[in-house]
Each structure stands twice: as C-alpha cells, then as structure tokens.
Amino acid sequence: MKNVLFVCVENSCRSQMAEAFGKMHGDGVINVYSSGSKPSGVVNPKAIASMKEVGYDLSQHNSFGLDEIPQIKWDYAITMGCGDECPMILADNREDWGLPDPKHMEPEEFAKVRDIIESEVKDLIKKCK
C-alpha cells in the first residue's frame, strides 16, 4: 500500500475531500491522510454538505496540521493548489493539482471542484496499483 498525503492551507475543504475520496475508492491500495500548513481547526460546512451528496460523512473528520499527522515515509504528497503557502513535504512523488479554493463558492461551483478532486484521486489510485 502507498502512503498518500493531501495538503492544503486550512485542511478544511480540498484536502479533506481528497482524503475522503481516497478512503472511498482506494481501500487496499492507498493509506490516506490530509493536513494543512495553517489548519483552521474545523472542516468547512460546505465540504461536509457537498460530500454528503456523494454518500460520505465528512462531519467526523478533523482539521490537522502537519505536526499532527503520522511522521511516515510518504509515497505521494499532493498539494491542492495553495502555491507558496503549502510547505515542501518530503515524498517520493510530489504533485500540485492547482485547484481553486472553493470555500467561498456557491454549492454548484463547489460541487464542480469536488468532482474534479474525485477524478484526480481515482487517477492517482490507478497509478498506485
């Protein structure tokens, strides 16, 4: 199994949804975690509502900083598009998905970002098989 870390600034929207999709689609292929460089401490209610639409309860997730996740060897570190605010994570493979932060988007636009994240996570899982 590959260890995958999804990182954004607040660990409240994009990285949380990526972790959720990793858990939904990557069982037995990837171990997933998410964190933020400046964690908000809460998961965005819009992310919770958006993930509920696809059958995942994100309300049980917590927002973590980099110092609160396991210090393990990362096979993949995926940043969500947070530019200089995302720290350098040591990993065998690094990718930046360049996603807009949906926290101020309307539900329809938020769902588009969610769906892009799901597609990217599925592609990553294929690479890890």
Regions found by a protein language model. Name each.
Residues 76, 82-129:
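Phosphate-binding/catalytic loops
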Residues 1-67:
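Conserved active-site segments centered on acidic
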Residues 18-20, 47-49, 77, 91, ...:
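A sequence-composition feature that detects small, non-aromatic residues
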Residues 59-62, 75-80:
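Short amphipathic alpha-helical surface micro-motifs
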